[in-house]
Amino acid sequence: RFRNNSSGEEWPAQRKIIELRDWLRSNKFKKRQALVADLGGEVTLRSSIYQNENGSIRAQILFLPLANGTINHCLSFSSETLDNERLITDNLNTPYGGFYPENWNVCRKPWTRSAARLLKSHQKRIQGLELEAYEIDPVDEINQQQGVLERTNIEAGFLVPPHLQDELGR
């Protein structure tokens, strides 16, 4: 689970990542929250959440630690419609084996490294839809969505229920 990152370590000091932060700011995305999640074995996943002016698009930047000590990053744009459809456009390059909830519409573009092109693709997907402004705290929203994703995959038989994981694994 994610929690607030109060350590001050948020944006890695890498040119491309700093350029992404500046791009978000210049495109009127405002920082909402810095988050961190412990993945075990001293591996920490950091994330920064930004939101556009009217609150209809959230940007989540994931900072992924690599074995060689460098940091990779992925970007995800998400929006929700008034009828509870969740649209996600991201460039995550890690495989996902599992199921998404029926109201999620996910578009993966792992080869799109340009934030501008990824945002343009997301804006095309949400054009003409009635969007709901995000008001929930990012850490709460992300953890809720993670719970929804886990439940969906437990119900589909892809993941083992938590009470059986010690015996059977995840």
Language-model segments: residues:
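Alpha-helical membrane-targeting segments
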Residues: R1, G169-R170
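Structured extramembrane domains adjacent to transmembrane segments
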Residues: A13-G169
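Transmembrane-cytosolic junction motif
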Residues: R1-R15
